């Protein structure tokens, strides 16, 4: 079973490398949002520093959401998704490999580039470890929850708006905990409580969402 997971993970990685625009779009979006915000609110460093925890997390959330609409699109259109559903291997395991590959090449890249843009907003260097850890724990949850919506809307021609309406309410706890951890660190308070809750959400999402994604794909393929 682990061999199948590894093979599918490698396959998805190769496919993503062939479509560099899909990898670059959310990262460019994240960078543009962060770069434009100081132009909108003014150059006051104290104001930017105060707003930076929420801004970084909202930009990351929207960047992840932007990348999810086409997550299963190509597999659905070329018939690969039907083969997945008919495969003797657990569909939940197959979709977990696909979502993991997506996160490794988009979500993880976003996590790694976030300190640079956070420093641009005046976030102190002492807060960077909390920023990295919160995004490292939170962005997989965003990808997994978003994949549930992507699975349900993959058969729709214009499912982007519906995907956002379905998934954004589910993102609220992650947004509150992630930005809360960063805000606590900015104020010199312990952020371990927020991070532990984020870790719990990550474990819960890894356990439950693959089955929800598999069920959503079966519904979409069967329509």
Swiss-Prot record:
It is found in: Cell inner membrane. Its main location: membrane. GO terms for cellular component: plasma membrane. It is a multi-pass membrane protein. The chain crosses the membrane at residues 23-43, 52-72, 103-123, 128-148, 161-181, 195-215. Keywords: Cell inner membrane, Cell membrane, Cytochrome c-type biogenesis, Membrane, Transmembrane, Transmembrane helix, Transport. GO terms for molecular function: heme transmembrane transporter activity. InterPro entries: Cyt_c_biogenesis_CcmB, Cyt_c_CcmB_bac. One of its GO terms (biological process) is cytochrome complex assembly. Belongs to the CcmB/CycW/HelB family. Required for the export of heme to the periplasm for the biogenesis of c-type cytochromes. This is Heme exporter protein B. The gene is ccmB.
